[in-house]
């Protein structure tokens, strides 16, 4: 039983690292696009859509992080 718990814990830790990386990636990309848009003199719809997309992805991955942390706490 302990063997399986250790495997599950390692898997969850690996997934948490992946989630945190994805959150960081989408946050930094969104920030770069926002800065680029602020420097532009005209409105770019594609850029606005990309910013919106990365904002939604940050929300989704933050929710996934919360769920995974809850599961990790329940398994301890």
Question: What is each residue range found by the language model?
Answer:
Residues 1-28:
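Short, charge/polar-rich alpha-helical segments
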Residues 31-74:
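Short, charge-rich amphipathic interface segments used for partner binding and complex assembly
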């Amino acid at each position: 039983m302990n063997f399986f718990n250790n495997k599950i814990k390692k898997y969850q830790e690996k997934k948490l690292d992946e989630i945190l990386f994805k959150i960081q990636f989408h946050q930094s990309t969104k920030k770069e696009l926002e800065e680029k848009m602020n420097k532009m003199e005209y409105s770019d719809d594609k850029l606005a859509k990309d910013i919106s997309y990365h904002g939604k992805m940050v929300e989704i991955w933050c929710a996934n992080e919360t769920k995974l942390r809850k599961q990790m706490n329940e398994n301890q």
